[in-house]
Amino acid sequence: MLIDETIAQYHKTPWKGETTNLDSYRNSDDGSVLYFRPGFRQFLEFAKGPIEPNIALGIWTYGNAAYSKYVERAICEKFNLDKSPFRFVYSVDEIREDLRRGYEEKDVRRIMKTFPGEFTEANTFLVDNRPANVHHRANCQNGFVIESFDLRNPRYNLNNDRVFADLQSLCKRIVKNHHQLPNNRPLFSKKNIKLMCVGKYHRKYKVGNEIKEIMSSE
């Protein structure tokens, strides 16, 4: 998952607008605050629950390595976790390295090569609020686009945010049908979308002169 603004948003000072029922983490050193997207606590509990196969989470941010580790630590402290719920924590360093070797931004192939057999094109997807990270060829059948969690944006409605409810529903479908998903077929191939009955998330977008078919909660 991306951090800003997918699961959390960083603010140098406390947000003066509506934050009722939002989990937050305040940095005692500089007074900055991380606000967590509605439903994140419940999704964490779901992901680490008694689910077979297990749901593995990861962080991938455009921030630097220090920031990504800070967010990981903040999540552990805020939600009283004895150990990190994240299988990996990536930052802009991994993005730059991938671009140098001809990969795309937030390229899921990095994850699959780092954890061979554990993460595959049949069981892995990137959740991102930046459509360009899902439109490209490496992620278009292994990505899920969501609305930005942006408290500063007047168009964002805190009370209508169902992103984590959608993700939980999607993950349940994947887990339920995982035995029927071929190892050599991308998770969100058209056949898999039909098999898992998740067509309501299947969207068509025009990107330049191309029509892109991707999964999205928007």
Model-inferred region functions:
Residues 1-101, 195-198, 212, 218:
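Alpha-helical substrate-recognition element adjacent to the catalytic core
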Residues 66-218:
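C-terminal cap/substrate-recognition subdomain and adjoining C-terminal extension
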